[in-house]
Amino acid sequence: MAEQTQLAPAAFHLPDLVAIQRNSFRWFLEEGLIEELESFSPITDYTGKLELHFLGKQYKLKRPKYDVDEAKRRDGTYSVQMYVPTRLINKETGEIKEQEVFIGDLPLMTDRGTFIINGAERVIVNQIVRSPGVYYKSERDKNGRLTHNASLIPNRGAWLKFETDKNGLVWVRIDKTRKLSAQVLLKALGLSDNEIYDKLRHPEYYQKTIDKEGQFSEDEALMELYRKLRPGEPPTVSGGQQLLESRFFDPKRYDLGRVGRYKLNKKLGLNVADTVRTLTSEDILAAIDYLINLELDLGGCEVDDIDHLGNRRVRSVGELLQNQVRVGLNRLERIIRERMTVSDSDSLSPASLVNPKPLVAAIKEFFGSSQLSQFMDQTNPLAELTHKRRLSALGPGGLTRERAGFAVRDIHPSHYGRICPIETPEGPNAGLIGSLATHARVNDYGFIETPFWRVEEGRVRKDLAPVYMTADQEDDLRVAPGDVATDDAGYILGTTIPVRYRQDFTTTTPERVDYVALSPVQIISVATSLIPFLEHDDANRALMSSNMQRQAVPLLRPERPLVGTGLEPQAARDSGMVITSPVDGTISYVDATHIEVTADTGEKYGYALQKYQRSNQDTCLNQRPIVFEGDRGQRGQVIADGSATEKGELALGQNILVAYMPWEGYNYEDAILISERLVYDDVYTSIHIEKFEIEARQTKLGPEEITREIPNVGEDALRQLDENGIIRVGAWVESGDILVGKVTPKGESDQPPEEKLLRAIFGEKARDVRDNSLRVPNGEKGRVVDVRLFTREQGDELPPGANMVVRVYVAQKRKIQVGDKMAGRHGNKGIISRILPCEDMPYLPDGTPLDIVLNPLGVPSRMNVGQVFECMLGWAGQLLDARFKVTPFDEMYGAEASRLTVNAKLSEAREQTGQPWVFSDDEPGKIQVYDGRTGEPFDRPVTVGRAYMLKLVHLVDDKIHARSTGPYSLVTQQPLGGKAQQGGQRFGEMEVWALEAYGAAYILQELLTVKSDDMQGRNEALNAIVKGKAIPRPGTPESFKVLMRELQSLCLDIAVYKASTEDYEEDKEVDLMADVNQRRTPSRPTYESMSVGDIDDDDD
């Protein structure tokens, strides 16, 4: 294809998109870990004789046992061992022992920002939480009076809440306990009346509290404090003192954190040093003073908005890990203290004191089961990138879905350029999980910053470096959006400019603008920024599109879009799927699996490419070189493509010829009609790799064996297995085929009667093993691409009880078929309803058949008109042999820029091709199309173009499912649900109503009895079907018996009676449970209930 036409200056280069993960983990290694180790040092025993010091600054990490690929292959964890020099000091003898001790394994981050835990790639999602600090809020009481309160929230420790009441008294609550008078707390801190009055701007308001309560001395105040916090215990002064000390002034128990101290100083105008992380009496006085000023409404004070991003901060990997290390060290400290006390002080060494288990367990728990440690979404490079940039308000220390109201989920003006207003899940998590905007970064305090250009006298200073600002700093400035029009010198054009000022959207003159946003793309996330003509789409559809692009399956031959936004190369590069050259140099060697670059200085750099590996989502990860031997390579240039990338650009779908028209009702309700070409030419074919695993365990009756000798299996089924009973690589397998042969020893009890009979007659011991082989599940087929064998002898770590583990990888090519889900980039999704032969598809005047027919009714009501612009510009691109990069929000280049550009390009295409039908001025974008079946033209011209369509991961092959016989639920005896359990389809209450309405009584009876939970009836019915006899009358469903038992357990005398007839007068009770104890319940219907007599009957 020819070089791309630039319709807009390329968006300002984005920062490194995975930096948030990498920087955070680097901070943890350089500062966070040391900080934690030093805060626990020294640990003294209960008598104070022994001291153990951790020299945190000198900790060491040993090289990882396996590298990244090896860890994945062995199902291991990619981690390093942490060693810390420790010093044990015996105070009595003055003896000092120094030793380096092992304190645990620390999983290492890969260069792509992920962790490998037990062989699977995981991502730690960033958490967005309320920042520690002081928050003021106003509430109306039931009489409509405005009262104010303040909450002092630490990083960890007790909350302190100050409130005023209708009488103008000031109260304090400690950790949501009962109210205390504010003067009790202040006096207990040891402050005199004069000191208190000096610090308050309006002491007369506080005086009311003293008048009402009376004076307290310091001792009385401490006693009162103790009484309120520990009711029922005899109060003492020393107890009160100790309680107060430990609650607020002990750094172990109470910590504001760096951020909390910074926020407190900022809000209350204090100058307390950054290192003081506990509360001071000055803080408490200032907080009360601010509250009184709010209450008197004297200006200069305002209540806080908790949803403002200045009051919410991001906790990334480093900090989350640091908190977890603190938990582990806390447990470790307890153990060390106990060991110091119990053991003999002479024989003690640091190594015998420090047990790595608690720390290892805490870290393992965090990576293995924390809500924020997630299995990485590897469907395609974009999914991977977005996952690392995700912001979640859920998780430990965050919100819960049920408690989160509308305010928390809503878009806030301070989100501008920090959190994407569009990308969030649909459903219960909407608004709680967001995505970082493209240019946003997180500062040292954890607040999100976004860049702006400075404006001086109406001139945008793009020559200066952009200024990064937090939401707080930006509040009092007038900030214009990124798409304001400027002249060549940078002066803002126009007289009224839209700006954001103090959380409001207003207008102002160019001279009063303080800053301008860096780029129009700044406010949205990476996934959203890949939607061309985004400004013409409704936000709900843009949200669906952002989420669906992450579900696009990498195709066999990726193709980059004709119409893009210019951010595709960077998205691909930062996802880590493509390989870039580290230096300027020459490509000295290339083959399918390896690339070597020789730098100009002579150094050599080698890269091994990933070939056909399985991703977490069963898609295929594969890299292919795009350079040749002898080529020059520049630093940062892409030298190998990954899955779903082409020439270093993200390529999630295919450009195909699309028309918007109804066709015989096949595209009713968003259904999609496609041409057979997409199947034959493998346009939408993808490779999926499934993993099947089996382990040979040690059982009570002996070990299980992986073998070729499987009982009752013909030679035909074993032809693909090697001598050990394991399938060979390259074999084609279909459902039911054996992948790994395995036999399990079985005891006497689980032998069917015919085997017992044989042994009784011939006295021979039939081989007492059971076939327990790994077979291909229902509906799966493919080619075996890899087999891996793990045994203890090779030094592999196996699960307890397993002697051998075999893993088989089966790859399948999935062509597109009816039932698959497809989508465009504008939230236009649908299911394929029919695949037409090419000759029946509508065709263009030059005879080209269409690839796909979409319903035009999908556009107007959904208001995603961007798809129409895209398809027409794509059509022009194909005819002109050009690709377009269209940055969203293009009105800064003039009104209706999108429409004018598209029409101009289409008329240019008409001139170049010399085909007048390509573009008509009367009906722009519409073309006369002919019916492929009759050759007649359709009644009206149709919108035709090239759209970029994706195939999504919801494939019909993974969903289609049927059941004949299968497992039943234990209690209700009804079939289980779901494909994985080989379940049935639930015939629910409403479906029953439908059959009742039709009067289909017998079908309904069968559904509720023999097809479901009439245990005896279903076995009899199965036997009857096998023998071709009439199905007997159904019995009582098990669930009815369960219901009766439940009612009887509530002491209700409930039973079933046979109504009276002429033979006997009174009703007769029927015992439904009569046959329950006699029968042995088979988990599946069996044929054992056939008697010899039945078999004879058949021959009659």
UniProtKB/Swiss-Prot annotation:
Listed Gene3D superfamilies: 2.40.50.100, 2.40.50.150, 3.90.1100.10, DNA-directed RNA polymerase, beta subunit, external 1 domain, DNA-directed RNA polymerase, subunit 2, domain 6, RNA polymerase alpha subunit dimerisation domain, RNA polymerase Rpb2, domain 2
Positions of region (Disordered): 1064-1100
Reaction catalyzed: RNA(n) + a ribonucleoside 5'-triphosphate = RNA(n+1) + diphosphate
GO biological process: DNA-templated transcription
EC id: 2.7.7.6
Domain of life (superkingdom): Bacteria
GO molecular function term, any single one: DNA binding
Keywords: DNA-directed RNA polymerase, Nucleotidyltransferase, Transcription, Transferase
GO cellular component, one term: DNA-directed RNA polymerase complex
Polar residues bias spans: 1079-1089
CDD domains named in the record: RNA_pol_B_RPB2 (cd00653)
Subunit description: In cyanobacteria the RNAP catalytic core is composed of 2 alpha, 1 beta, 1 beta', 1 gamma and 1 omega subunit. When a sigma factor is associated with the core the holoenzyme is formed, which can initiate transcription.
Protein function: DNA-dependent RNA polymerase catalyzes the transcription of DNA into RNA using the four ribonucleoside triphosphates as substrates.
Family of this protein: Belongs to the RNA polymerase beta chain family.
Protein name according to UniProt: DNA-directed RNA polymerase subunit beta
Species annotation: Synechococcus sp. (strain ATCC 27144 / PCC 6301 / SAUG 1402/1)
